[in-house]
Design a protein with these regions (language model features):
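Core dinuclear metal-dependent hydrolase active-site scaffold
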Residues: 1-19, 92-148, 229-235
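Active-site neighborhood of phospho(di)ester-bond hydrolases with catalytic His/Asp-centered motifs
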Residues: 1-4, 23-34, 38, 62-64, ...
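Active-site metal-binding motif and surrounding structural segment of the metallo-beta-lactamase
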Residues: 7-60
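Short, charged/polar "capping" segments at the starts of alpha-helices
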Residues: 9, 67-72, 203-207, 234
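Structured loop/turn residues at beta-strand edges in well-structured enzyme cores
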Residues: 18-21, 57, 89, 105, ...
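P-loop/Walker A phosphate-binding loop and immediately adjacent motor/lid segment at beta-alpha junctions
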Residues: 42-60, 120-127, 168-196
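Acidic/polar short surface loop at catalytic or gating sites that assists cofactor/ion binding
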Residues: 49-92
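Cap/insert and terminal regions of metallo-dependent hydrolase folds
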Residues: 141-230
Length: 235
């Protein structure tokens, strides 16, 4: 789900001992560099494994028409010819539309346009086979098109760029982000069971989890999760 802002994703895979050969599905929400550029490295890595005949099956990247078009354009400009041969053959670009449903990895996904005015961006509802539901809301506050999929879900992955009292410092509103306070109030209104806060500023350091959780619990009665990079937990 998104690719970070660049080659950091390679280090993350290495640090967490993740196997590229087992990665077959990815989703890219939008074109902004902190989400987009790492996906180019993902595609390059998969293409090199394919060239070496060390990757079984195909790789599928899901996204809206705008972001997929730009990924494909960049890949055609900068990847070597041997890698480009796998684009749209073994490396597949799967277009999804607003409210479209797809069955992926034994899960049911419903994709939706988050209504961003900065760049076309999609989120999704993921329904587990045990009935649980997860919503990835994109990196802006939930609007009505996303809220209707988020009522009573088990997990809401919501951006919150900073604490409410530090908005003037980090300018969350200027960039169409929200604070922990707003994210928590929305989650409470939607009766979400678990709120996972991501896409945060990175200056708070080791106290971020504690401080963000403390603010969230003032407005939200469910479980609050503020993961650190590389943290793994059971959803």
């Amino acid at each position: 789900m998104d690719g970070t802002g660049g080659s950091d994703i390679l280090r993350a895979f290495d640090t967490m001992d993740l196997n590229w050969k087992k990665l077959h599905y990815a989703f890219l929400s939008h074109e902004h560099t902190d989400h987009f550029l790492g996906m180019i490295w993902v595609i390059r890595t998969i293409a090199e494994l394919l060239e070496l005949e060390e990757y079984e099956g195909d790789f599928y990247l899901y996204g809206n028409d705008v972001v997929l078009g730009k990924v494909l354009h960049v890949c055609r400009m900068i990847l070597k010819k041997q890698s480009q041969a796998f684009l749209e053959t073994r490396i597949k670009f799967v277009l999804v539309k607003d409210h479209e449903r797809k069955h992926i990895l034994n899960y049911d996904f419903t994709f939706f346009d988050i209504g961003s005015t900065k760049a076309k961006q999609y989120g999704f509802l993921m329904e587990y086979d045990n009935g649980k539901k997860l919503v990835f809301a994109g990196d802006e506050p939930l609007k009505e098109n996303g809220k209707k999929y988020s009522k009573n879900v088990d997990w809401l992955l919501s951006e919150a760029f900073c604490l409410f009292d530090e908005e003037l410092k980090f300018h969350a509103y200027q960039y169409q982000h929200q604070t922990v306070k707003e994210a928590s109030m929305i989650a409470q209104d939607l009766k979400v069971k678990n709120l996972l806060i991501w896409h945060t500023e990175d200056q708070t350091g080791k106290k971020r989890k504690e401080r963000y959780t403390e603010e969230a619990k003032q407005f939200y009665k469910g479980n609050v999760w503020v993961p650190e990079d590389g943290e793994v937990f059971n959803m």
